[in-house]
Amino acid sequence: MTHIIIDGDACPVVDSIIDLTTETGIFVTIIRSFSHFSNQLYPPHVSTLYVDDGPDAVDYKIVQLSTKDDIVITQDYGLASLLVDKVLIVMHHNGKIYNSKNIQQLLDKRYMNAQIRKQGGRHKGPPPFTKQDQKVFEKSLLRVIHRIKELD
């Protein structure tokens, strides 16, 4: 059964994912570090798992829990690269789907930007997340959900 796992520490589309999966039978797990603790109540199909605050603790837990039928939502290219061949789909919160062809290019870009920073340079970060970005993500996730439901 398909399950969505969210890298929840800095994901701006958690509410969208919850809303879009409410009537689908798809369960959602939000994985966060304790430093991002929330008392927010979620619907029955949503669970929250908290892990220690250590570096990459959330990532390690996601890798540990994920299976071939899962959809993982993350903006972390390193985590995505570990999951691309393990899970059904890995998505960015901008709606783009990571795959074995584009992940290496994204990792290379991340490495080059780190080298620029190491030398004292700067590069432009991502623009702020907008309502339009959220709509693009929602449309992309709905396409994925419909494809999965057709296969069931």
Swiss-Prot record:
Q: Which HAMAP family does the UniProt entry name for this protein?
A: UPF0178 (MF_00489)
Q: Which InterPro entries match?
A: UPF0178 (IPR003791)
In Swiss-Prot or TrEMBL terms, this protein is called: UPF0178 protein SAR0734
Protein family membership: Belongs to the UPF0178 family.
Pfam families membership? DUF188 (PF02639)
Superkingdom is Bacteria
